[in-house]
């Protein structure tokens, strides 16, 4: 099988592991810089070009697209879909998951547990926005933030109002969420592949920090999931339409709540914490499911 990994950096842990796993299972795996691709979209034979020539036909692609290049990256994925190539995550699903607000609206519609959340840009009653999610302390997030950037914990009503006013001054879209104190600065990352949780780890925030992202100094350890947590992760992935993703869950007094669904989860932390060969599981899923035009939208949506 011929597989392409769409990644801007072939030396990243996740990219290297996926390439190694694919090759060890006997497949041909290329790493292609998404931003250096360009597309022929006007002819009746759609193509993706790279370094002066049309790329060969690939049986499957694995998009490893960073948040900052979502627009162009998903356009490249869509072009591959139009050519009949199987993508482990479809362009529409990636775009859907990258929009935090749309993701939460979809999860809410499916009745999946979430923290109480408000969305605003220029609210005329900041106090009511805060009150509506249960009052301070609250977590305030920039809608476009990633890896814990643009996420602030406001301990008091006054602090929350000041932070929201500051973000309003930037004309930013913001989410205001209840603070799940009982989680103790920890969350659970569930790695879902093909409708199954194949690995899970607990991420604990560093001392004095409430964000558990490993990029922010958090630590990772093995965790045992409850049946409800496992079901929540699987349901969240299904709602987003993602075959492979990381689902971040907090343990609240009301059961598991989903914080985020990540369409391009890093593999280093979870493989190290669990000792599982997640990269090979991803390749094996592709081998079983990659058939020409085996995407729901075929690049149309």
From Swiss-Prot:
Mg(2+) 2 binds at residues 260, 262. Mn(2+) 2 binds at residues 260, 262. InterPro entries: ATP-grasp, ATP-grasp_RimK-type, ATP_grasp_subdomain_1, RimK, Rimk_N, Rp_bS6_RimK/Lys_biosynth_LsyX. Its cofactor is Mg(2+); Mn(2+). Mg(2+) 1 binds at residues 248, 260. Transmembrane segments: none annotated. Binds 2 magnesium or manganese ions per subunit. PROSITE patterns: ATP_GRASP (PS50975). Its EC number is 6.3.2.-. ATP binds at residues 141, 178-179, 187, 211-213. One of its GO terms (molecular function) is metal ion binding. Keywords: ATP-binding, Ligase, Magnesium, Manganese, Metal-binding, Nucleotide-binding, Protein biosynthesis. Mn(2+) 1 binds at residues 248, 260. GO terms for cellular component: cytoplasm. GO terms for biological process: protein modification process; SOS response; translation. Pfam families: RimK, Rimk_N. Residues 104-287 form the ATP-grasp domain. The keyword ATP-binding applies. NCBIfam families: PRK10446.1, rimK_fam. Belongs to the RimK family. PANTHER family: RIBOSOMAL PROTEIN BS6--L-GLUTAMATE LIGASE (PTHR21621:SF7), RIBOSOMAL PROTEIN S6 MODIFICATION PROTEIN (PTHR21621). This is Probable alpha-L-glutamate ligase 2. It comes from Pseudoalteromonas atlantica (strain T6c / ATCC BAA-1087). The lineage of its organism: Bacteria, Pseudomonadati, Pseudomonadota, Gammaproteobacteria, Alteromonadales. The gene is rimK2.
């Amino acid at each position: 099988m011929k597989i392409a990994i769409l990644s801007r950096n072939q030396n990243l842990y996740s990219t290297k592991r996926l390439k190694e796993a694919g090759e060890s299972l006997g497949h041909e795996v290329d790493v292609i810089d998404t931003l250096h691709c360009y597309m022929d979209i006007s002819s009746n034979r759609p193509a993706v070009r790279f370094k002066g020539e049309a790329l060969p036909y690939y049986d499957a692609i694995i998009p490893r697209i960073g948040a900052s290049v979502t627009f162009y990256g998903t356009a490249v994925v869509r072009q591959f879909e139009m050519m009949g190539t199987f993508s482990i995550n479809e362009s529409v699903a990636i775009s859907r998951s990258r929009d935090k607000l749309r993701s939460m609206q979809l999860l809410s519609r499916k009745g999946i547990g979430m923290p109480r959340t408000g969305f605003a840009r220029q609210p005329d009653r900041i106090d009511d926005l805060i009150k509506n999610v249960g009052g301070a302390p609250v977590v305030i997030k920039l809608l476009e933030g990633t890896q814990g950037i643009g996420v602030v914990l406001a301990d008091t009503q006054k602090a929350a109002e000041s932070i929201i006013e500051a973000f309003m001054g930037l004309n930013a879209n913001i989410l205001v969420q209840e603070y799940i104190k009982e989680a103790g600065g920890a969350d659970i990352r569930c790695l879902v592949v093909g409708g199954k949780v194949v690995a899970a780890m607990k991420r604990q925030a560093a001392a004095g920090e409430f964000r558990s992202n490993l990029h922010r100094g958090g630590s990772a350890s093995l965790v045992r999931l409850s049946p409800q947590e496992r079901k929540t992760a699987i349901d969240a992935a299904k709602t987003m339409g993602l075959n492979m993703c990381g689902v971040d869950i907090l343990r609240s007094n009301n059961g598991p709540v989903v914080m985020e669904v990540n369409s391009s989860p890093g593999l280093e932390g979870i493989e190290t914490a669990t000792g599982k060969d997640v990269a090979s599981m991803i390749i094996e899923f592709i081998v079983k499911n990659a058939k020409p035009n085996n995407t729901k939208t075929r690049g149309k949506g």
